[in-house]
Design a protein with these regions (language model features):
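Bacterial N-terminal signal peptides
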Residues: 5-15
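Short sequence/structural segments immediately N-terminal
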Residues: 3, 18-151
């Protein structure tokens, strides 16, 4: 009974956008890449992966809210990069293979829904709410396009 109550509280907090992650809840992009190597390789070629190059020194917490992965500006950033978990949510709770394969459970445990263009736009618009450097943000463009391997 208490497990059901805990899951309900977690679902309500996630739906309300409340940050529940602690430093130990973040796995880092390299950990995600152990099961998703094509996505990791594709992401590594993007501006999201190269965020650190934009800052001459350690960025302020307010910058890391969009240019980092973690709890910034309210808490610590785990990386100066827009890593997997910056968009998909802190992964420690849902990273196990059997959990990741069960999407409803993974979502309850923190996996952010990015399965539709509307869901992706909602995630992306948290940082891409305005035009940057004269470039209009295209929410329909793939973030880390994976090229299919022809045989």
């Amino acid at each position: 009974m208490w497990i059901r109550a805990l899951l309900c509280i977690a679902m309500l907090a996630i739906a309300a956008g409340v940050a529940l992650a602690a430093r130990r809840d973040w796995t880092g992009s390299a950990a995600c890449g152990t099961c998703h190597p094509q996505q990791l390789a594709a992401w590594q070629t993007t501006r999201h992966a190269m965020t650190r190059d934009r800052f001459p020194a350690k960025p302020e917490g307010r910058c890391l809210a969009c240019h980092g992965t973690g709890e910034a500006p309210a808490g610590p950033a785990i990386a100066v990069e827009v890593g997997c978990e910056a968009c998909h949510g802190a992964g420690a709770a849902y990273a196990e293979d059997d959990v990741m394969r069960n999407r409803p459970v993974a979502r309850v445990l923190g996996l952010t829904d990015t399965s539709t263009p509307t869901a992706r736009a909602a995630v992306c618009s948290q940082c891409h709410a305005r035009q940057t450097r004269g470039t209009v943000f295209d929410s329909s463009a793939p973030v880390h396009p994976v090229k299919s391997v022809s045989r």
